[in-house]
Regions:
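Hydrophobic alpha-helical connector segments
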Residues: 65, 79-111, 118-119, 129
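Amphipathic alpha-helical packing segments from all-alpha helical-bundle domains
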Residues: 121-144, 152-163, 182
Length: 207
């Protein structure tokens, strides 16, 4: 059953940009992302193509907007993360929150990721930037102090963990995403052993 906050979100009037993003995601769930044009998205959204291009000059700009929407939802749901938990458990919860948000459009996300991996350097660079922003957000939500070279290393480690969990999640057919959770827990446990040797390790919080 939908909770009160979900009901509130569903009653809010969508903006034209949200309509464009959702139209793109619907198409991506049905066909390869690299085969979709802005004209296709405009037709799906039932808006003039010129109006869509005014908001999104390129498909990449549309994906950036979608990425920001995901970040906003993760930020809102991340308030449920308890600072009483150790850092490893906080990171586990934060990553699962992000995957849960992406789960609203899993088929579309899979299509976009496949196209990104086969895309041009500009698309790949944008994907790397989005990953870094997402991992930075996760560390912030979990109360990890910002700044320092050590944090840069932590971001790289967490990025690899997240990408591996994402790979499993895209193919996870268990009702409770059990395979994904097991993969993520195992990776975070291994990272815990590695990063405990570093000062202010993100996985070395209160026990």
């Amino acid at each position: 059953m939908a909770n009160a906050s979900t009901k509130k979100r569903s009653k809010r009037k969508k903006t034209p940009s949200q309509d464009g993003v959702e139209a793109a995601l619907r198409l991506a769930a049905r066909m390869p992302w690299d085969g979709i044009s802005l004209a296709d998205i405009a037709a799906e959204a039932r808006v003039p193509e010129d109006d869509l291009r005014a908001m999104f000059p390129t498909k990449l700009s549309l994906l950036k907007t979608y990425g920001r929407q995901v970040d906003e939802q993760v930020e809102a749901r991340g308030t449920s993360i308890s600072m009483d938990e150790n850092m490893k458990d906080r990171l586990f919860e934060a990553m699962m929150i992000r995957l849960d948000v992406l789960g609203d459009h899993r088929d579309a996300v899979a299509s976009i990721i496949r196209a990104t991996l086969q895309g041009n350097p500009k698309t790949i660079t944008a994907g790397a930037s989005a990953l870094r922003r997402a991992m930075t957000q996760l560390l912030d939500l979990c109360g990890e102090p910002s700044g320092g070279l050590c944090r840069q290393f932590k971001l790289r480690v967490l990025g690899l963990i997240y990408l591996n969990a994402l790979r499993v999640w895209l193919k996870d057919d268990t009702p409770d995403t059990g395979k994904t959770m097991a993969t993520l827990d195992k990776a975070l446990t291994r990272a815990d052993a590695l990063l405990k040797s570093l000062p202010t390790s993100p996985l070395h919080g209160a026990r």
